[in-house]
Amino acid sequence: MRQTEITPIEMKVLMNHIYELQKGVRQMVLFTCPKQYEAYATKRLCSQNMDFVLQPAGKNNLNFYIGCKECLNAIRLIVTRPLNELTPEEDFILGTMLGYDLCAQCERYCERKTACKGRCDKCQHAQ
């Protein structure tokens, strides 16, 4: 009897992201997974010739930014600390790069920017 390998849901999500990137549905994705899947995810991305940037996401997770080199070069400059510490401007740029709804990103930016008026911890790095 042949034994089938069970693929964790996180890896199914990764495979879907790879498919969408290869088909041109998306230009860049952010994939978050538990650290235990780092080797599998890295091997899969490399086998598909996908460029990516890997960053820690808390104690137990990793963020894989996957996409074209130009976008990933920008990610390396913009995302230099945990996502919850990004300035409203950095958060807006990242969301837009990831293809999130532009109007929703504008609304989120305005809410974040006016809520703290540059005086809270989240805006400490704002220029």
Residue ranges and their predicted role:
Residues 1-127:
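Domain-length accessory/inserted modules outside core catalytic folds
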